[in-house]
Structure formats: C-alpha cells, structure tokens
Swiss-Prot record:
Organism expressing this protein natively: Halorhodospira halophila (strain DSM 244 / SL1) (Ectothiorhodospira halophila (strain DSM 244 / SL1))
HAMAP family tied to this protein: Ribosomal_uL10 (MF_00362)
One MF term in the entry's GO annotations: structural constituent of ribosome
Database matches in InterPro entries: Ribosomal_uL10, Ribosomal_uL10-like_sf, Ribosomal_uL10_bac, Ribosomal_uL10_bac_type, Ribosomal_uL10_CS_bac
Keyword Ribosomal protein among UniProt keywords: yes
Pfam families tied to this protein: Ribosomal_L10 (PF00466)
Record-given protein name: Large ribosomal subunit protein uL10
Keyword field contains Iron: no
Length: 175
C-alpha cells in the first residue's frame, strides 16, 4: 500500500527540516539488505545520533531542494537511504562505513558536506573527521603545549643553578 498525499507531505517536511539543520549527508542504496539488517542499521543510527530514513526518490529530491544537499539529487535513484549527521560531521559517514564492513550490500552513492558533492570514495575521509570532543581535546592540547614548555623552561633555570652550585660546593669540599 502506497503513502497518502498527506503522509508524503509530512515525510518531505520532516526530511527537509532535518536536512536544513544537518552538517553532512550520505546517500546509499540498500538493495539486498534484509529487514533484520535494516533494523540493526536503524538502531545503530539512533545510538549515534544520525537521522536515517528510507525515502522515495521523488520525495527525497523535494525534501533536499533549497538546502545545501540539493547537489545530491542526481544520485537519487533505486532503493534509497539517506543518513544525516546532526551534531558530529563524521557520524553518518562512520555509521555507513562501519555497517558496510559487515554488509557489503549497502552501496554508497554520494556524500555531501558544506554544499559540495563528493563521490563514495570520500566516505572514509569524512568518517575520519574527529568528533566534537576529540577536536576540542586536540585543540586544548595544542594550546596547552607552549604554556607547558614555558613553565618547564622557567622551572629549569633555578634547578640548573642549584645543581651548578652543588657541583661547585662538592668540588671545593673535595679539594
């Protein structure tokens, strides 16, 4: 049984609202996946904060129209699955990449980031982006390194002086 017009409009509005706020998107063909595998993928998407939706191609084109993911419409054919990253730019790509390791039936069509369309070969690059927490910790470590070096150098001067004086004292006592 097909979707009613109202259901289609609601789906387009829902996907459009998510696409408007999303950072990245991945489109994939799910042909060959069982219902159980799709359930696993959906559960993993919920855990990772990724919006995952099976959408008819025409509805998907309408949903992404006017968003930065409009560039993906050429790849909307066949059984289509859309994954949007809400908070972490690499989340959708990591989800699809990790799921593909176990299920080769999932075929990546396109990856979009910042209004630019990338091919499926860029999935790993997008998936390797650090999470927000990882990026912040790297930034903090980078900012902390010069200050820590300065503190170490500043503390080393008095220590070196004390060691030099101790060596002179030991030399005088020995003489």
């Amino acid at each position: 049984m097909g979707l009613s017009l109202e259901q289609k409009k609601a789906m387009v509005q829902e996907v459009a609202a998510v696409a408007q706020e999303a950072l990245t998107a991945v489109s994939a063909e799910y042909r060959g996946l069982t219902a159980g595998e799709m359930d696993q993928l959906r559960a993993q998407a919920r855990e990772q904060g990724v919006y995952l939706r099976v959408v008819k191609n025409t509805l998907a084109r309408r949903a992404v129209a006017g968003t930065e993911f409009e560039c993906m419409t050429e790849g909307f054919y066949g059984p289509l699955l859309l994954a949007f990253s809400q908070d972490d730019p690499g989340a959708a790509a990591r989800l699809v990449r990790d799921f593909r390791k176990k299920n080769e039936s999932l075929v990546v069509r396109n990856v979009a980031f910042g209004g630019t369309l990338y091919g499926p070969e860029h999935l790993d690059r997008l998936a390797s982006l650090p999470t927000r927490d990882e990026a912040l910790s790297k930034l903090m470590a980078t900012m902390r390194a010069p200050v820590q070096k300065l503190a170490t150098t500043t503390n080393e001067v008095p220590g070196k002086l004390v060691r030099t004086l101790a060596a002179v004292r030991d030399a005088k006592e020995a003489a």
